[in-house]
């Protein structure tokens, strides 16, 4: 008699599960001759709602997980930058070491979502970076 395999899945499906944080465990019961698979879901993918909470199906979608991760990353950014401390970014046009933190490896100015600056300071920062590039320091 051949062993019964429950939940047999293809390798591409396993990769997709792994990419979404679902890891697969196999346990073999020697006495019964059966292979059982249990799936462990990553906690970042599960949503714990308090009792009596009204929820939307969007709360369980991948889009919601991406939004949560995006805003959590912004909250957790512990960058103690001079820019966030109230200094005027235009004053740093001659300091490429400071301004290079706000430029990508290809030389593009990072977006406000990434820098975490206000709209006003982001404009000032962009102007300072362009000035620094124009005078040849960056």
UniProtKB/Swiss-Prot annotation:
Record: transit peptide: 1-16
Principal location listed in the UniProt entry: mitochondrion
Annotated localization: Mitochondrion
Biological processes annotated in GO: mitochondrial translation; translation
Cellular component annotations (GO), alphabetically ordered: mitochondrial inner membrane; mitochondrial small ribosomal subunit; mitochondrion
KW Ribosomal protein (keyword) present: yes
Keyword Lyase belongs to the record: no
UniProt cross-references to PANTHER family, sorted A to Z: 30S RIBOSOMAL PROTEIN S18, SMALL RIBOSOMAL SUBUNIT PROTEIN BS18M
Similarity comment: family membership: Belongs to the bacterial ribosomal protein bS18 family.
SUBUNIT field: Component of the mitochondrial small ribosomal subunit (mt-SSU). Mature yeast 74S mitochondrial ribosomes consist of a small (37S) and a large (54S) subunit. The 37S small subunit contains a 15S ribosomal RNA (15S mt-rRNA) and 34 different proteins. The 54S large subunit contains a 21S rRNA (21S mt-rRNA) and 46 different proteins.
Name the UniProt record assigns to this protein: Small ribosomal subunit protein bS18m
């Amino acid at each position: 008699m051949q062993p019964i395999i429950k939940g047999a899945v293809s390798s591409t499906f396993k990769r997709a599960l792994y990419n979404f944080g679902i890891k697969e465990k196999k346990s073999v019961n020697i006495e019964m001759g059966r292979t059982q698979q249990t799936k462990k879901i990553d906690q970042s993918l599960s949503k714990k709602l308090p009792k009596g909470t009204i929820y939307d199906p969007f709360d369980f979608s991948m889009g919601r997980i991406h939004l949560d991760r995006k805003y959590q990353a912004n909250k957790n950014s512990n960058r103690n930058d001079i820019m966030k401390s109230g200094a005027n970014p235009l004053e740093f046009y001659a300091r490429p070491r400071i301004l290079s933190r706000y430029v990508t490896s290809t030389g593009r100015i990072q977006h406000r979502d990434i820098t975490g600056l206000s709209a006003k300071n982001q404009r000032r920062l962009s102007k300072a970076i362009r000035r620094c590039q124009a005078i040849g320091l960056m």
